[in-house]
């Protein structure tokens, strides 16, 4: 018989830096899950990623106090800010431009995010990420 799902917990945790402090501890603790077990498993799963990049994770909690988790790729906005070398996007993206990204940088971001994107082709995925860049106040070159 399949385990009964008690909760789906969505968090953003820095890659390789999960610890019992908020937001991980309280989110897992109130469901009765083993916090240290999650931290060790998450840090092992994200050891290949660049340390410190926010990584979305979806934790499925079961009635017998066990869990499984799925890590997603880093949000496009974080990757775009890193590529453009800016700390935050523009407050008025249509009038104030805060940085530039090239098509090559967009293609690299698409390669990182390809598992989470629904686009069928590389060109469509690049256009999706370019739209995100423009909505943050970044100029897309190329």
From Swiss-Prot:
One of its GO terms (cellular component) is cytosolic large ribosomal subunit. It holds the Pfam family Ribosomal_L11_N. PROSITE patterns: RIBOSOMAL_L11. Keywords: Methylation, Ribonucleoprotein, Ribosomal protein, RNA-binding, rRNA-binding. Gene3D superfamilies: Ribosomal protein L11, C-terminal domain, Ribosomal protein L11/L12, N-terminal domain. The keyword Chloroplast does not apply. One of its GO terms (molecular function) is structural constituent of ribosome. InterPro entries: Ribosomal_uL11, Ribosomal_uL11_bac-typ, Ribosomal_uL11_C, Ribosomal_uL11_C_sf, Ribosomal_uL11_CS, Ribosomal_uL11_N, Ribosomal_uL11_N_sf. One of its GO terms (biological process) is translation. CDD domains: Ribosomal_L11 (cd00349). One or more lysine residues are methylated. The keyword Ribosomal protein applies. Part of the ribosomal stalk of the 50S ribosomal subunit. Interacts with L10 and the large rRNA to form the base of the stalk. L10 forms an elongated spine to which L12 dimers bind in a sequential fashion forming a multimeric L10(L12)X complex. Forms part of the ribosomal stalk which helps the ribosome interact with GTP-bound translation factors. Belongs to the universal ribosomal protein uL11 family. PANTHER family: 60S RIBOSOMAL PROTEIN L12, LARGE RIBOSOMAL SUBUNIT PROTEIN UL11M. This is Large ribosomal subunit protein uL11. The lineage of its organism: Bacteria, Pseudomonadati, Pseudomonadota, Gammaproteobacteria, Lysobacterales. The gene is rplK.
């Amino acid at each position: 018989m399949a385990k009964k799902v008690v909760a789906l917990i969505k968090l953003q945790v820095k890659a390789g830096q999960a610890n019992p402090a908020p937001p991980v501890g309280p989110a897992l603790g109130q469901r009765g899950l083993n916090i240290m077990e999650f931290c060790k498993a998450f840090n092992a799963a994200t050891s290949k990623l660049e340390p410190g990049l926010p990584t979305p994770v979806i934790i499925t909690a079961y009635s017998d106090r066990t869990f499984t988790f799925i890590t997603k790729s880093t949000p496009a906005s974080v990757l775009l800010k890193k590529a453009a070398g800016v700390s935050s996007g523009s407050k008025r993206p249509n009038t104030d431009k805060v940085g530039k990204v090239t098509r090559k940088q967009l293609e690299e971001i698409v390669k990182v995010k390809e598992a989470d994107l629904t686009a069928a082709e590389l060109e469509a995925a690049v256009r999706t990420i370019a739209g995100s860049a423009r909505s943050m106040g970044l100029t897309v070159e190329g």
